[in-house]
Amino acid sequence: MLFKNSKWIGSFSRRSRLKPDVDEILEKYSIQNSKESIEKIVNSQKRIWVEIGFGNGENMLYQVLNEPDLLFIGCEPYLKGVSRLLTNIEIQNIKNILMWTEDARELIANFPDNSVERFFILFPDPWPKRSHNKRRLINTEFLNLLAKKILITGEIFIATDHQDYAEWIASHIKQCNSLIYREDDFTSYTLTKYHRRALKDQRKVRFFKVSVINNLQTMDQ
């Protein structure tokens, strides 16, 4: 089903449910979507990174193990991937992860402005049919929302192996007055399931590093 109660056009659908024991574990890592609870979390953390659509959680695990001082919030509606990540963080006793399994845009809207150091959007659904393009996660409205939430020194990392979507992403970033981007490989990153699939199928992967437009120092690094 698509999340029809959201003000956003649905960009995903859910096809499964968690087993009761896994659902119980998820409660320990779930973030509450209210401005008050999110502001409390933000005020208690030095650094916050957010991944929108974390899949099986490969990138999240890699990042939190290498950056133990940050809080990583992952958003993923597909519960099979959520279950796999929960298993891994329980085995490895990881404490600096929180999860959200509904529409990421509803959660991000409640973040204080200038509070997130980094956003990851890795291989979002390209919705390749022209009639479905309106369902694409990345558009000017959503990018403007992210621009409000990232720190002045923050970055948005986007990856896609769908060339039409890449051109769409570039076009929509250019429509955001507060954002600028360059195409460049990520230096701190691990291959995800969809990246490995792209390499196997010999599809070019395009990486976007997006910064607030007056953060020239970051863009020059």
Swiss-Prot record:
EC number: 2.1.1.33
Keywords tagged on the record: Methyltransferase, S-adenosyl-L-methionine, Transferase, tRNA processing
List of catalytic residues: 125
Top-level EC class: transferase
Function: Catalyzes the formation of N(7)-methylguanine at position 46 (m7G46) in tRNA.
Name of the protein: tRNA (guanine-N(7)-)-methyltransferase
Residues reported in the UniProt entry to bind substrate: 129, 161
Residues in coiled coil: none
Swiss-Prot/TrEMBL catalytic activity: guanosine(46) in tRNA + S-adenosyl-L-methionine = N(7)-methylguanosine(46) in tRNA + S-adenosyl-L-homocysteine
Gene encoding the protein: trmB
GO molecular function, one term: tRNA (guanine(46)-N7)-methyltransferase activity
